[in-house]
């Protein structure tokens, strides 16, 4: 069904980040029609993630201003460009910052969920076709972000960056499967491949850390140790599968030694869900000699480096990283939505606040106060 706006420029509301650390403002933005291989999506719900804040803060070397941030969302296809066959107007979709073209060296390798097709464009805030933005305000271009830009009532994405999902799924909930929840679950299931009976340590009990706990519980982990400097998070974490808690502030010894002592030599798997390089070292060094695996999930600030003694690795520990939990976006996000509909994974429980796009600055404040897991913004109000 063709929409009445197909082929036309749409003027809509979007939250524009004009410069680093300056509050975003709601603006009337012109969104151009999709070109070949592109999809224009009406965003209905978008959540906030720490990655959005990281770029907005000015610490991201790839951060470009002015831009429209946002990458965890859900909506409905408004129109498609030439050659787009996998989605059509009216389809319910989740935009995916991790593309999946199924044709590049990465996609064909069978070894990774990374995709090389559009990264050269999305990394600099433009679309592949003409290396230009589809967003503008009175003729002035506004950069895209992560190939998604979901803090807008309409966005344009590459067709390799959009997953068609079951229309029965509530978009205000499954939008979370566009980043945080999927990342945590996949870190356990795909990257670490945690087995039943394993002892797991999770550093950082935000949305991603709690999703790691949920994944570890479903994998049959025998002990799931949550580590956070905010003890208020511990009650909530129990609901996601965490069995015991450690606050590093309560101990004089280095946290890795505390965990090693608690676990008869170390954990089988650890997950760093903060993005702090010193914590990444602790997470590795609390792993058991001979077989312990540590997965870096959190994104550290640009230019920071990790370090440990080589002996840690020589004696059998493994250090790994994960992006989007190792999930192939277009193929597996629809599968995750089905798991949610079958009540096999939690999603609703991560949504602690619901607001409107116009409240975006207040929502970012909440994210930083620590009492908020995911705040979902409705764009149509």
UniProtKB/Swiss-Prot annotation:
Q: Where does NAD(+) bind?
A: 50, 204-209, 228, 233, 274, 297-299, 322-324, 374
* Binding annotation for an alcohol: 51, 71
Q: Does the keyword Transcription apply?
A: no
Disulfide connectivity for this sequence is: none
Q: Where does Zn(2+) 2 bind?
A: 101, 104, 107, 115
Required co-factor? Zn(2+)
Question: Which EC class does it fall in?
Answer: oxidoreductase
Q: Which GO terms describe its biological process?
A: formaldehyde catabolic process; heat acclimation; seed development
The family database entries (InterPro entries) matched by this protein are listed as: ADH-like_C (IPR013149), ADH-like_N (IPR013154), ADH_3 (IPR014183), ADH_Zn_CS (IPR002328), GroES-like_sf (IPR011032), NAD(P)-bd_dom_sf (IPR036291)
**Pfam families linked:** ADH_N (PF08240), ADH_zinc_N (PF00107)
Amino-acid positions noted as binding Zn(2+) 1 in the UniProt annotation, renumbered to this chain: 49, 71-72, 179
What does the entry list under GO cellular component?
Answer: cytosol
- One term of GO molecular function: S-(hydroxymethyl)glutathione dehydrogenase (NAD+) activity
| Reactions mediated catalytically | a primary alcohol + NAD(+) = an aldehyde + NADH + H(+); a secondary alcohol + NAD(+) = a ketone + NADH + H(+); S-(hydroxymethyl)glutathione + NADP(+) = S-formylglutathione + NADPH + H(+); S-(hydroxymethyl)glutathione + NAD(+) = S-formylglutathione + NADH + H(+)
Q: What is its EC number?
A: 1.1.1.1, 1.1.1.-, 1.1.1.284
Task: Give UniProt keywords alphabetically.
Answer: Cytoplasm, Metal-binding, NAD, Oxidoreductase, Zinc
Where does this protein reside within or beyond the cell? Cytoplasm
Note on how the cofactor is bound: Binds 2 Zn(2+) ions per subunit.
Q: Which family does it belong to?
A: Belongs to the zinc-containing alcohol dehydrogenase family. Class-III subfamily.
Q: How does it assemble?
A: Homodimer.
Protein name (database record) = Alcohol dehydrogenase class-3
Source species: Oryza sativa subsp. japonica
């Amino acid at each position: 069904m063709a929409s009445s706006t197909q082929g036309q420029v749409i003027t809509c509301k979007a939250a524009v980040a004009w410069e680093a650390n300056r509050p975003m403002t709601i603006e009337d933005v012109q969104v151009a029609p999709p070109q070949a291989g592109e999809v224009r999506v009406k965003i209905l719900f978008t959540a906030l993630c720490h990655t959005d804040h990281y770029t907005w803060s000015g610490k991201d070397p790839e951060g470009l201003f002015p831009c429209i941030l946002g990458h965890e969302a859900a909506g409905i296809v408004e129109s498609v460009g030439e050659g787009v066959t996998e989605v059509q107007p009216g389809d319910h979709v989740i935009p995916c910052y991790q593309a999946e073209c199924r044709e590049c060296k990465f996609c064909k390798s069978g070894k990774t969920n990374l995709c090389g097709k559009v990264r050269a464009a999305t990394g600099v805030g433009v679309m592949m076709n003409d290396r230009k933005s589809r967003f503008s305000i009175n003729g002035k271009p506004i950069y895209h972000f992560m190939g998604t830009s979901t803090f807008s009532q309409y966005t344009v994405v590459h067709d390799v960056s959009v997953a068609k999902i079951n229309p029965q799924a509530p978009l205000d909930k499954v939008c979370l499967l566009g980043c945080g929840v999927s990342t945590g679950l996949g870190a356990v299931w795909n990257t670490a491949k945690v087995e039943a009976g394993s002892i797991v340590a999770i550093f950082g009990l935000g949305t991603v850390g709690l999703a790691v706990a949920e994944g570890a519980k479903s994998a049959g982990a025998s002990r799931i140790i949550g580590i956070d400097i905010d003890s208020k998070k511990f009650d909530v974490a129990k609901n996601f599968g965490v069995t015991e808690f450690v606050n590093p502030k309560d101990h004089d010894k280095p946290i890795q030694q505390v965990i090693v002592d608690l676990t008869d030599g170390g954990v089988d798997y650890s997950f760093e869900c903060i993005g702090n390089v010193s914590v990444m070292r602790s997470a590795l060094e609390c792993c058991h000699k001979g077989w312990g695996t540590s997965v870096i999930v959190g994104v550290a600030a640009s230019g920071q480096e990790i370090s440990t003694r080589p002996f840690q690795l020589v004696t059998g520990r493994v250090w790994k990283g994960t992006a989007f939990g190792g999930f192939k976006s277009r193929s597996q996000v629809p599968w995750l939505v089905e798991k949610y509909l079958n009540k096999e994974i939690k999603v609703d429980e991560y949504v602690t606040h619901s607001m409107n796009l116009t409240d975006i600055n207040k929502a970012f404040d909440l994210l930083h106060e620590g009492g908020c897991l995911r705040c979902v913004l409705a764009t149509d109000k």
